[in-house]
Amino acid sequence: MGRQTHSRALSVWANGERVGVWRLPTRGPMEFAYDPAWVASPAGRPLSLSLPFAPGNVVHKGPRVLNYFDNLLPDSEAIRKRIAQRYQTDTLDAFDLLQAIGRDCVGAVQLLAVDDAPAGVERIEGTPLSDSEIEAMLARTVSSPALGARDEADDFRISLAGAQEKTALLWHDGKWQRPHGATPTTHIFKLPLGLVGNKLADLSTSVENEWLCLQILRAYGLPVANAEIMTFGKQRVLSVERFDRQLHSSGQWLLRLPQEDFCQVYGVPSHRKYENEGGPGVLDLARILQQSVSAQQDIETLLASQILFWMLAAPDGHAKNFSIRLLAGGQYRLTPLYDVMSIWPVEGNGPNQWSWFKAKLAMAMWSRSKHDAFRDVQRRHFNTMALRCSYGANAEPLIQRLIEQTPEVIARVSAELPERFPGKVAERIFKGLKSSAATLGKMPPA
């Protein structure tokens, strides 16, 4: 590709207010400048803690700008390639991709041509879809378009971060709809993962696995995204209600709620989402959450999640799977938990399995050294982390509570399993959870 010969720009909007301009100069690093009216607005707040309001409205430049916007996109290069092919973008760069699909991003952000403005923000518009139409849409999500093929869905452009195949729709008036104009989506549809990783672990039941893990966390008292298993024709999905959407008090339109994940908070690229790849860890998250409007509760949720990830053998609790809701006046708080999956249903050393002995937490427990392998983590490490996170002298009351809750949690969630829920998934997750709780209960606290 030849050298860029002219400056390019996209305008950034939130709920009908212009936030600023993202610019790609002909030379030098990319830039982001807040609109003075947004800085002065009662709704105004930084896009990210890594891109704060600054005296004199100084323009932000460089990697933090790129990494904020790049983190709005899917992590997977294969998914990015499909987006580029479908919308015929010149490159896989964040600017090109978001120019094509940035109308409905995570949080409040909409990206439009620099001279455009979102129309119809204060109304809800959409086209109702039948189950067969949704089934066809889901099939298109995981396929590359035929040469020269275009259809109405090509004008439905959304950007969903993460490594998993997914799309999103609007739920309104008791119907699934494809939103129009400035109307946002309200639910994310996540498709089964299939074979994953170097050993091709069989996560074809990822929809049921994630649903069950979320119900378990909720039963322990942790805030989680609302989710439901749904079937459209032959296609099974996990429908996740977006907690970055809210019906306006008038009941007439949907608000987009500002939020960011912890890669964006720290201005790091998505390929560094795991701590062992240079990404944020538990102490980094806790450092931010100490200034939350609900600091003690948020840090407890963070610590409880790590204990339960260990009990569930859930290895994917990385920085992109924790987010903060950005509030007015520069305040913030932790969002509900999301994207949690256990390896217990596929644990083993054979083909299409995932060895527990080799699996790790995405974020390590630190004492005098690093402990992230499931087999190495001890109760005392959770206690040390509680002290280092300024939660308390230790995590013993929290640990004991989680252990004591486990039988009731298993009984309650087991009673709520949907019809035809795969027995192996439930049995192995419940068995692993019960065994981990017993093991944790026998470990010395120090």
Which residues fall in each region the model found?
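Anionic ligand-binding catalytic core segments
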Residues: M1-A319, S323-A446
